Amino acid sequence: MTFEPQIPSWGNEYKNYLERLKSYHDWLCKTGINNGLISEKPLQYVWDEFIVHSLYFGKILQNIKNNDKNIYDLGTGGGIPGIPVALTNPNKLFTLVDISESRAFELQRLKNILNLENVEVFNESADAVLTDNNTYISRCFISSKDVLKNIKQLKNVTYIVSSNGENLNENKEKFHVKQEKFTINSTNIRHIDVINVK
């Protein structure tokens, strides 16, 4: 399989960041795999599922008011989706949160390699940073249904999370959920839920 680092038409504004995104991709495919941050995958899979998928989080963040504060990537693992979103949104602050000390160590090294001044790495459980008035993102860490359970006591929170597109049957008095559908390449569609606590 050949590797083509494409960006779908919905992400044309991200093409200026292609070289930095490819640097992160290279890091994931070497250091990320060698140190257990991600499992071994084909190069194209890593690009489509980890880089392009993450970029759609950034597209959603551009349209959310009150996201000028720090954005938390909970259960970030190898920096997914936080690193691609931070690379393409240099004026926003991101905190990558992971409970694994070894992952946090590697992410701190990556932050220095990529010279990411808008990124902090926090070695802690996700529960430790869930508070009112914040924006959170997660790709594989948690399901949308579990997000609804975990943030129901909070106020003024936005949580953007990968999903399978299922109906959440959320409490409409407490939550507003917008389900986004997008392509990561010419054929594959993915879903992200934007969950707001009222």
Segments predicted by a language model, with ranges:
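Conserved S-adenosyl-L-methionine
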Residues: 73-77
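Class I SAM-dependent transferase core
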Residues: 2-66, 72, 102-105, 109, ...
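Conserved SAM-binding loop of SAM-dependent methyltransferases across substrates and taxa
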Residues: 78-91
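N-terminal cationic-hydrophobic initiation segments that often serve targeting/anchoring roles
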Residues: 62, 86, 151-152
